[in-house]
Amino acid sequence: MPEGKIVKALSGFYYVQHEEGITQCRGRGVFRKNKITPLVGDQVVFQADNPSEGYVLEVFDRKNELVRPPIANVDQAILVFSAVEPDFNPGLLDRFLVLIEYHNIKPIICISKMDLVDEKMRETVEAYANDYREMGYDVLFTSINTSESIDILKPFLEGCVSVVAGQSGVGKSSMLNVLRPELELKTNDISSHLGRGKHTTRHVELIAIGSGLVADTPGFSSLDFIDIEVEDLTYCFPELKEASQYCKFRGCTHLSEPKCAVKAAVEEGKITEYRYKNYKQFVEEIRERKPRY
């Protein structure tokens, strides 16, 4: 039986990319019986008599899975945040980073609209970028109006399945339109009343860019820490994870425990205060989370 990758899921149909092209498929009833939902990014076995009528027969094991957006087997996440309009938001970026780290996906931070910043804002954004680079993250600067700066991103996409995510209105669809102009993905201006953009992507689809596949993922409604526990959170902050091995107490939450290496690193300036503040805020959110039954 032929194998392929689901590159689009829409209205109960799964579009499977394989050596000979793309075949439109439906899922077998056994998936519903076993409560399995094929996802974009799934590697599958399928059967088809023609390109428009096929059936997905088997879904291979996934290395990771996101719920919102519903996508599997992601190699990396391109987290797009604008320098201005809306202003760069490290708190929201850290929220995305925690979720991506928790799912063992490599994050790449892409700061867009650098062509719109004044000198003061540029210094602020570059200072944040240097902080995140010191934590081990790749940070790229792009300007939506110049294709040359978008080319900076292309080498990072080669041979990978990438998710594009980020704050609404930061230029995710505009970025993909520059990478692949024929896509003509719809973009919306920022709402002056809310200071944020309306989401313009309606479904998840993997798009070929070079030798890579990129998903323009809709929404950011999944930013609640539904599955993450307090003990997981340290491991989603690389610099806290590094320092925590020197804490006196195993299972230290880095809040009130004595001889905490993380708090010491914050006091010494080795961990930024805003990252530690966000960590504490996330701990509080998780502890106040209502239990699920």
Curated annotation (Swiss-Prot):
Broadest EC class assigned to this enzyme: hydrolase
GO biological process, one term: ribosomal small subunit biogenesis
Origin superkingdom: Bacteria
CDD domains: S1_YloQ_GTPase, YjeQ_EngC
Major localization class: cytoplasm
Residues binding Zn(2+), per UniProt: 247, 252, 254, 260
Cofactor: Zn(2+)
Keyword Nucleotide-binding included in the entry's annotation: yes
KW Zinc (keyword) present: yes
GO molecular function terms noted in the UniProt entry: GTP binding; GTPase activity; metal ion binding; rRNA binding
UniProt xrefs under InterPro entries: G_CP_dom, NA-bd_OB-fold, P-loop_NTPase, Ribosome_biogen_GTPase_RsgA, RsgA_GTPase_dom, RsgA_N
HAMAP family: GTPase_RsgA
Function: One of several proteins that assist in the late maturation steps of the functional core of the 30S ribosomal subunit. Helps release RbfA from mature subunits. May play a role in the assembly of ribosomal proteins into the subunit. Circularly permuted GTPase that catalyzes slow GTP hydrolysis, GTPase activity is stimulated by the 30S ribosomal subunit.
Similarity comment: Belongs to the TRAFAC class YlqF/YawG GTPase family. RsgA subfamily.
Subunit relationships: Monomer. Associates with 30S ribosomal subunit, binds 16S rRNA.
Record's protein name: Small ribosomal subunit biogenesis GTPase RsgA
Species of provenance: Bacillus anthracis
